[in-house]
Amino acid sequence: MNDSLSINQKPVIRCESVYKIFGTNANKLLEKASGPISAEEFQKAGCIIGVNDASFEIHKGEMLVVMGLSGSGKSTLLRCISRLTDPTSGEIFIDGENLLEMNSKQLIELRRNKMGMVFQSFALLPHKTVLENIAFPLIIKGLPTEESIKKAMEMVDLVGLKGRENYFPRELSGGQQQRVGIARSLAVEPDIWFLDEPFSALDPLIRKEMQDEFLRLQASLHKTIMFVTHDFDEALRLADRIAIMKDGIIEQLDTPDNIVLNPATEYVKKFTEDVPREKVLKIESIMDKYDQSLAGSNTVSKDAIIETVAESILDSKENLTVIDVNNDNKPIGILQPKKVITVLFGK
């Protein structure tokens, strides 16, 4: 979890009661809507739902992963937030500005200067080299060619493609092509990064490698990110918070730990049942409030994944003191070894 996030921050992205409905009777449906519209009402109206009353915020430096199966509305929601498609109803604000009130010129400027986008299809220009593909949006933006190439070379280094800058897309692997796509989207130094299933076309080993690369980039760049995936394990691995969608509705929006420990609906619970909790949960999610009288002499970081410290926890004959290593090792909680066993094994 990004510790810099604060509920007191003004959100970078704010979404209020967003609907995307396909069909000629969409406006009639919305006349009576005060919340999610039922499947029966959609069927009667002959409409198809894309997004059904979505409201949420994304704060600066946060990675919100929108997860759902095919047809859940996750990609439609991203397209509405980036205004690649217009929502049927609702409000969307980017840094306090109403996205839906912007004209075409303002939208182009916003996308050129504030937004980066990466999609499942690499969409590279086949007749241009890696360097030329990355420099392309900078040249379109109006930067001199020499400056664009210099910046593109920095991006080549950033994503680990040094030595391949003069290759053509056909000479690269799928993972390398997606690195070019990522570099191209970062070249304009966007504040907001939209990624729609960027790794789903890659084989499992390359996918894991790209997830590692993505986390490395985010640790240094601190972008505000909306990331779409159908893979719950990927969502757990990458997200600060996860929004799980079904039939256009956000079923639950919470931290990965809270979703695993406290699924809000039966639908969400199905995703969490087979999750190896020890590989996902952080100590902070299962600790008790700090009480000096119960504190033990051994300490454990609040951000540690249970699996990485399980042996020392289970060998301990006393409680452990949970500390915040980013705040001078301040004690913030108590961890009972018995509670770890209960959380992991239900005993």
Regions found by a protein language model. Name each.
Residues L253-D254, N262, I334:
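ABC ATPase "signature
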Residues A295-N327, P331-K347:
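The conserved cystathionine-beta-synthase
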Residues A187-D191:
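A short, proline-enriched helix->beta-strand linker immediately N-terminal to the Walker B motif
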Residues S82:
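Helix-to-loop junction immediately C-terminal to a conserved catalytic motif
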Residues G90-N98:
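Conserved ABC transporter NBD signature motif
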Residues F168-L172, Q176:
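Conserved ABC ATPase signature
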Residues D247-G248:
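Conserved ABC ATPase "signature" C-loop
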Residues R14, E31-E40, E97-N98, I139, ...:
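Conserved ABC ATPase "signature" region
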